[in-house]
Amino acid sequence: MDKQTLVIKLGGALIENDEALTALFGTLKTFLDEQHRPLVLVHGGGCLVDDLLKGLGLSSTKKNGLRVTPFEQIPFIAGALAGTANKQMMAKAIATGIPAVGLCLADGGLCQVTQLDPDLGAVGDCQPGNPALVTGILAQGFLPVVSSIGITADGQLMNVNADQAATAIAEALGADLVMLSDVSGILDGKGKLVPQLNKATALDLMEKGVISDGMAVKVKAALHAAETLGKPVCVASWRYPDQLLKLLAGGAVGTQVTL
């Protein structure tokens, strides 16, 4: 594996959009066939969690863009993310001809997870851990598909923000990082794409409330990753497979987040 590993974070409503998911994995298959570059997918699945909790008659709230996760809800959330979402991603990979292995953040000690904030409940802070298992899986030609469920050192299941999880995994692997979501990148106050975003501008936009909630979490994770990895991190959309192939080949798509 001479080529730099690429970590792609998949988010937003992608998992509930079968047509978009099919197109995305078709693009990833083309990329893998042409580039022969090690690839790791990291996913959340907030929409599945919302649907499940609603069906169970349970409420769900967010604080500063992070889902508040009462400990009594974590079995359901883990089931939705590490179970349903992960296996749906794997199924799509397999149907596209990509051999895949489903993982969570705890497998092989990939990430070290601790409780982030008692006010958020079973929400984890994620730090890079041991990449050996994932490196071995990549060396065997498999695509690791990693859910954002972690486990603390004392055995507590934790819900981790998928942007933060992808950042920690990229750090552990020394990989490049691309974050894909519903939107085309980071948008300014007028809804226009910001092609390049540095730390000073990002902090200014967050202070003004232009970047807030989930997008603020994403930008903070991207800034942290850019700082730790010492390279730009791309925030873009999964909606346009042709643009995605250009992006994966090194083209300018979405927002490049730098220091």
UniProtKB/Swiss-Prot annotation:
Residues binding substrate, per UniProt: 45-46, 67, 159
Cell compartments where the protein resides: Cytoplasm
A Gene Ontology molecular function term of the record: acetylglutamate kinase activity
Gene Ontology CC: cytoplasm
Annotated S-S bridges: none
Catalytic activity field: N-acetyl-L-glutamate + ATP = N-acetyl-L-glutamyl 5-phosphate + ADP
Site (Transition state stabilizer): residue numbering on this chain: 9, 218
Metabolic or biological pathway: Amino-acid biosynthesis; L-arginine biosynthesis; N(2)-acetyl-L-ornithine from L-glutamate: step 2/4
InterPro entries, A to Z: AceGlu_kinase-like_sf (IPR036393), AcgluKinase_fam (IPR004662), ArgB (IPR037528), Asp/Glu/Uridylate_kinase (IPR001048)
Gene3D superfamilies to which the protein is assigned, alphabetical: Acetylglutamate kinase-like
Keyword set includes Membrane: no
Main location: cytoplasm
GO biological process, one term: L-arginine biosynthetic process
Domain of life: Bacteria
A matching Pfam family: AA_kinase
Enzyme Commission numbers on file: 2.7.2.8
Keywords, comma-separated and alphabetical: Amino-acid biosynthesis, Arginine biosynthesis, ATP-binding, Cytoplasm, Kinase, Nucleotide-binding, Transferase
Matches recorded under HAMAP family: ArgB
Role noted for this protein: Catalyzes the ATP-dependent phosphorylation of N-acetyl-L-glutamate.
Family to which the UniProt record says this protein belongs: Belongs to the acetylglutamate kinase family. ArgB subfamily.
Protein name: Acetylglutamate kinase
Organism: Aeromonas salmonicida (strain A449)
Lineage: Bacteria, Pseudomonadati, Pseudomonadota, Gammaproteobacteria, Aeromonadales
